[in-house]
């Protein structure tokens, strides 16, 4: 096989020269970024000291190079990937303002209660003053909560309508102050009283134990409500990194695509939040990794069972679909037949766990009164399920139309916050990055293993249909012709399967120039850089710019 010079350079820069050169390049890049921010977003006029800005950019650049040097010294791709996840995930942890991940405000309150040793649910119980102050200063969906709309005048004096939707920063008048998330930090730091906050309508414990442990450690170290939030985020990130490490250790075929998904900005954004989606995504990637194994062993079955039961505690019913993979995992045909009994036991166990969690949430609940439906009586689950079964063609039209109008959600992988902060560059680049990972790590195979490929395709399509149907019967009034509430993160397991199949197809159609190890190394480097860039862009959109100008 011929080797292209681009992938196999004849001479490599010695390590004693490479890392100093990398540090200088990173400093130059950080300085260029700071200069761009300073000029394009008028940071001098907004009171940002130039020395502080350039100093922070340089320090961050050196920190990233130092982290890359440490990661390079780790042995094996899974360990290096876990290091990249921790490094880039930490950037997301601090780039994302408090309470901005989907439902993070409720997850924060429940996790804080658990960190105090409270495993029951009492609506009359309130939180400490600093927690209430943080909760009031940072409303969930901050961008939507601070969106302005109305009438203004253009340069010619004509009235025009304006809407600051999708902008985290806005400015009233060319010389007016810029309103941003910094105002919420100042409000929280100013102290003062805040209205009491009661426990949320959220009745689970197990999915919040990791972040509750992080909050407990932060509180023992003397941190307040804000420090507890970051402590919980970092604890979630560590668990996600461990699950991804285990998944990459399992996966021997198609590992490059799995690697790219673990480092996808949207994955890291959720992993570095207080949402239970952090370990939910880790469990998804762990279960999916068994498709890439040469042989599915009993120990693998134990890991699969643990991840499967945990994901069904957090999100029941839809995750029963993961049992389908048991019939397509590698192994002798006789073993696949035996897995039917194993799958039946897991399914019964998942249902038992679901009913126990539901009973626990009711039995230990007090002072909540009657809890109404989120969308009132317009949404009735069983009648809507029967409606879908009686009108399959109508639902198929609603399903396909919703996917089409949203670009099959592949163009929303850069949508952050509570679906209120789009980063268009990441919306465009994320699917391209996944396709690049598939191309870099494809390898020539004489024959495709039909069972894993059939399992990936079947699971991917059924998961998309199942996730959409679940949102239709639980959140969408039956008369609507569009399914509401769908998000790109719901489809990440299905996207993983489809890009894994793309990698297999490219391996059959192309002649890969790089060997498996070289391709995976390049994939790790590109995915890690893309993840770090995603965190920087998230910080920019929340704190620096673009700024919506209201004249």
Language model feature labels by segment:
Residues 254, 334-341, 438-461:
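Membrane-interface helix-loop-helix junctions at transmembrane boundaries of multi-pass membrane enzymes
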Residues 76, 223-226, 245-265:
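Transmembrane-helix signature of polytopic, membrane-embedded enzymes
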Residues 29-56, 351-352, 360-371, 513-551:
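Transmembrane helical bundles and short interhelical boundary loops of multi-pass, membrane-embedded
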Residues 118-229:
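Interfacial juxtamembrane loops and adjacent helix segments
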Residues 269, 300-316, 320-327, 350:
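Membrane-interface alpha helices of multi-pass inner-membrane proteins
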Residues 48, 358-442:
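Membrane-lumen/periplasm interface segments of multi-pass, membrane-embedded glycan/lipid transferases
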Residues 251, 287-303:
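Membrane-interface transmembrane helices that cradle and orient dolichyl/undecaprenyl
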Residues 273-280:
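Short acidic/glycine- and proline-prone juxtamembrane loop motifs at membrane-interface regions
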């Amino acid at each position: 096989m011929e080797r292209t010079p681009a992938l196999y350079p004849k001479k490599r820069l010695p390590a004693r020269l490479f890392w100093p050169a990398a540090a200088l390049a990173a400093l130059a890049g950080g300085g260029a970024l700071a200069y761009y921010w300073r000029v394009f977003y008028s940071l001098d006029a907004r009171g940002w000291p130039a020395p502080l800005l350039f100093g922070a950019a340089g320090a961050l650049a050196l920190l990233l190079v130092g982290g890359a040097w440490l990661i390079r010294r780790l042995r094996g791709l899974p360990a290096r990937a876990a290091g990249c996840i921790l490094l880039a995930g930490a950037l997301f942890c601090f780039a994302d303002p408090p309470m901005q991940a989907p439902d993070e405000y409720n997850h924060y309150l429940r996790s804080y209660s658990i960190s105090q040793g409270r495993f029951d649910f009492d609506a009359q119980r309130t939180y400490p003053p600093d927690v209430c102050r943080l909760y009031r200063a940072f409303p969930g969906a901050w961008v939507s909560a601070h969106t302005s709309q109305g009438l203004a005048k253009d340069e010619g004096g004509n009235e025009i309508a304006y809407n600051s939707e999708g902008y985290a920063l806005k400015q009233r008048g060319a010389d007016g102050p810029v309103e941003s998330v910094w105002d919420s930090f100042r409000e929280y730091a100013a102290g003062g009283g805040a209205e009491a906050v009661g426990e949320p309508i959220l009745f689970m414990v197990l999915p919040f134990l990791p972040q509750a442990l992080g909050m407990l450690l932060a509180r023992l170290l003397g941190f307040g409500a804000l420090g507890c939030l970051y402590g919980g985020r970092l604890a979630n990130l560590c668990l996600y990194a461990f699950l991804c490490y285990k998944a990459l250790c399992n996966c021997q075929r198609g590992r490059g695509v799995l690697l790219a998904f673990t480092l996808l900005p949207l994955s890291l954004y959720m992993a570095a939040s207080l949402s239970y989606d952090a370990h939910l995504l880790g469990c998804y990637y762990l279960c999916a990794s068994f498709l890439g194994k040469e042989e599915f062993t009993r120990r693998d079955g134990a890991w699969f069972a643990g991840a499967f039961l945990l994901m069904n505690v957090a999100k029941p019913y839809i995750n029963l679909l993961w049992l389908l993979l048991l019939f397509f995992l590698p192994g002798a045909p006789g073993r696949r037949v035996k897995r039917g009994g194993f799958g039946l036991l897991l399914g019964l166990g998942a249902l038992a766990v679901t009913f126990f969690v539901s009973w626990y949430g009711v039995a230990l609940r007090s002072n909540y009164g009657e809890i109404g439906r989120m969308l009132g009586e317009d949404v009735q689950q069983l009648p809507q399920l029967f409606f879908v079964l009686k009108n399959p063609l109508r639902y198929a039209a609603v399903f396909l139309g919703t996917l089409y109008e949203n670009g099959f959600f592949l163009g929303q992988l850069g949508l952050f916050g509570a679906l209120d902060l789009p980063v268009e560059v990441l919306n465009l680049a994320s699917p391209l990055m996944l396709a690049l990972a598939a191309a870099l790590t494809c390898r020539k195979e004489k024959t495709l293993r039909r069972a894993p490929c059939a399992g990936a395709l079947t699971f991917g399509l059924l998961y998309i249909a199942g996730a959409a149907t679940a949102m239709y019967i639980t959140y969408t009034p039956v008369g609507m012709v569009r399914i509401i509430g769908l998000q790109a993160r719901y489809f990440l397991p299905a996207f993983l399967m489809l890009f894994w199949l793309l990698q297999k197809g490219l391996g059959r159609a192309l002649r890969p120039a790089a060997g498996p190890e070289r391709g995976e190394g390049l994939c790790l480097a590109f995915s890690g850089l893309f993840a770090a860039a995603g965190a920087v862009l998230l910080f920019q959109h929340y704190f620096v710019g673009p700024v919506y100008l209201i004249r």
